[in-house]
Amino acid sequence: MSHPSPQAKPSNPSNPRVFFDVDIGGERVGRIVLELFADIVPKTAENFRALCTGEKGIGPTTGKPLHFKGCPFHRIIKKFMIQGGDFSNQNGTGGESIYGEKFEDENFHYKHDKEGLLSMANAGSNTNGSQFFITTVPTPHLDGKHVVFGQVIKGMGVAKILENVEVKGEKPAKLCVIAECGELKEGDDWGIFPKDGSGDSHPDFPEDADVDLKDVDKILLISEDLKNIGNTFFKSQNWEMAIKKYTKVLRYVEGSRAAAEDADGAKLQPVALSCVLNIGACKLKMSDWQGAVDSCLEALEIDPSNTKALYRRAQGWQGLKEYDQALADLKKAQEIAPEDKAIQAELLKVKQKIKAQKDKEKAAYAKMFA
């Protein structure tokens, strides 16, 4: 029997839906919602569904709960896939299925022909356990070797963040973990909208929003709304939440720029620049000096003559005690805005710090050779 590829396959409402709430470095990133192809690979789908709920108790082979909760994504390869499911050893050497240690390849009806496909990891033919991977690009070389049994229907943005975490070899440098998981029944809230009391009514990732990303004017309205929410958090000195909202704006902007014509996408540059600058300001308030420098560099890549970016980067350099770098940025800012009093005052302060540093070094040398 032939079946359409997942690329062309519409979502089947009778198939099970499950979710992962993902944490990276102890911080919640978001939710991935997956459809399991129980209509085509029922045994494989049921294995994964039960591992999401934890309803099968303790595994006889591993002696560990048959449950993905607390399980890491232990292997990440950019432009390929993210892998997890080893709930026992947590490093790719363990895990087991709900049917026993291993079970057979059910079928290979579906091809690995798009991002966001859920497929069984294995150690050869008929060695399926609990380990799985989610593709981040088409991977046709895996066809006929790994069983495709589901797809991401919400939260591909979360999967992309996982794909891009820093790795040492193929191991994430930060712990990437399934903090919560389970099954979503008909009528359940899929949990893709924020519940932070801020009035934010937009999904955290633009891929999950019911909006045409090519509609730049609509994205601009959403971005301004989110920026205003971020500004409210900034005014209340909730720097972390402000950064989250400004970063969310940048996700929507980048999503729209990728989809829209270049001329239309240029309309989004001012709101993007404003949010990057605001992130830099938040990081200064948090004494995250390197983070502030990095954010201001990003702003200067958008607008090389932006005096706010130069001024704030100079403050970041001072926090890092890189006074010569700060001086260079402030001199450039003064060339652009010679009448700006704040730049003049900061320039004087940096010159005084450089003098104090040199005086201290002279005193130390004098003492050394006295």
UniProtKB/Swiss-Prot annotation:
> E.C. number, please?
5.2.1.8
Expression across tissues? Detected in heart, thymis and brain.
Q: Where's it found, cell-wise?
A: Cytoplasm; Nucleus, Nucleolus; Nucleus, Nucleoplasm
Q: Which residues carry this modification: Phosphoserine?
A: S5, S198
Q: How is it modified after translation?
A: The N-terminus is blocked.
Q: Which family does it belong to?
A: Belongs to the cyclophilin-type PPIase family. PPIase D subfamily.
The molecule here is called Peptidyl-prolyl cis-trans isomerase D
Q: Please name the source species.
A: Bos taurus (Bovine)
